[in-house]
Curated annotation (Swiss-Prot):
Gene Ontology biological process terms, A to Z: D-ribose metabolic process; pentose-phosphate shunt, non-oxidative branch; pyridoxine biosynthetic process
Keywords: Cytoplasm, Isomerase
Subcellular locations according to the entry: Cytoplasm
Record protein name field: Ribose-5-phosphate isomerase
Top-level taxon: Eukaryota
GO cellular component, one term: cytoplasm
Principal place of residence: cytoplasm
Biological pathway: Carbohydrate degradation; pentose phosphate pathway; D-ribose 5-phosphate from D-ribulose 5-phosphate (non-oxidative stage): step 1/1
EC number of the protein: 5.3.1.6
Protein encoded by which gene: RKI1
Amino acid sequence: MSSLSLVEQAKKSAAYQAVDENFPVSAKVVGIGSGSTVVYVAERIGQLANKDSFVCIPTGFQSKQLIIDNGLKLGAIEQFPEIDIAFDGADEVDPALNLIKGGGACLFQEKLVAASAKTFVVVADYRKKSDNLGIQWKQGVPIEIVPNSYAKVIQDLKKLGAITVNLRQGGSAKAGPIITDNNNFLLDADFGAIKDPKALHDQIKALVGVVETGLFTSMAAKSYFGEQDGQVNIWSI
């Protein structure tokens, strides 16, 4: 078996175990995020016998498609602001279950769903584990901002200690900056190793023009990792 298929099997095992151990029997509203491991979360939830008894809230386009593809009932957070449990991936996780999220440009909706959930469970592969945020994930903290504030916010982030700040671009498919689902811009600010994610989040969030940061602190209850050797590793508070 190749190392890739071992990791892929571990991701599937981690996702299935996360659902089996945490999904409430009486759940009525379920948040489903995005990421390569969450694909298996949606698959497992789609196998539940009572899947017609709850609705699923997406965090973005990919998760909306996962919900539909697995025959699950699609809902909107505007209709269901109280979520029983949410599952999502992460770009980086530290031992205190602080997260960096937003590499896929959906951080606001991801944080809204996580904050609305009674229980928030992370599923990811071993590459997302880190002793400190900002070590494994080199691209920086994703920050959603109001478009006309970008020049000012970039200046302010550098005053807070950011080594580099980049306005995220759309790549070959789009000339110019990425536009989020909320019609905002995204910055990626590299602060190096982040010793106090909560304090940094608070400082960034206080800046005029900032809508939300990709620092998720004191939100996740558990994180399930698919390991390189095919095993599942669980971190919890």
